Structures are given as structure tokens and as C-alpha cells.
Amino acid sequence: TATVDCSGYPQSACPQDYVPFCGSDNKTYSNKCNFCNAVADSNGTLTLSHFGKC
């Protein structure tokens, strides 16, 4: 299972880089920062499905 270290999130501003992550909600997040912010907002219910677009 793919995992991401989201310690230090959420962050108030994310970079614009595009390195997609596919979440367990079947949504593509544009980069680690956006994905980890969503994980923080989900109280741990959101996980990484795989790296790359969904």
C-alpha cells in the first residue's frame, strides 16, 4: 500500500506544481500539499489510493 507522510499539514498555501496523487475518494489531487491538506481535513478518513491521476 502506498503511503504519504502528511506530518506538518495542513498548510495555508500550496505550491502550483503538478505531481498528482489519487485519493481513496477517487479524486485526483494536484500535489502532495493539496492531498495532505485534504487528509488533514478528513480527520484521517482519506488515504492514498495510488500515485498519479485517478
Curated annotation (Swiss-Prot):
List the Pfam families.
Answer: Kazal_1
What SUPFAM superfamilies does this protein's entry cite?
Answer: Kazal-type serine protease inhibitors (SSF100895)
Indicate whether Cell membrane appears among the record's keywords. no
Among the entry's GO cellular component annotations, what is one? extracellular region
InterPro entries from the entry? Bifunctional_prot_inhibitor, Kazal_dom, Kazal_dom_sf, Prot_inh_Kazal-m
Q: Where is the signal peptide?
A: none
Q: Where in the cell is it found?
A: Secreted
Listed as disulfide-bonded, the cysteine pairs are: C6-C36, C14-C33, C22-C54
Q: Does the keyword Secreted apply?
A: yes
Q: Which residues are glycosylated?
A: N43
Per its record, how is this protein called by name? Answer: Ovomucoid
What is the organism of origin for this protein?
A: Gallirallus australis
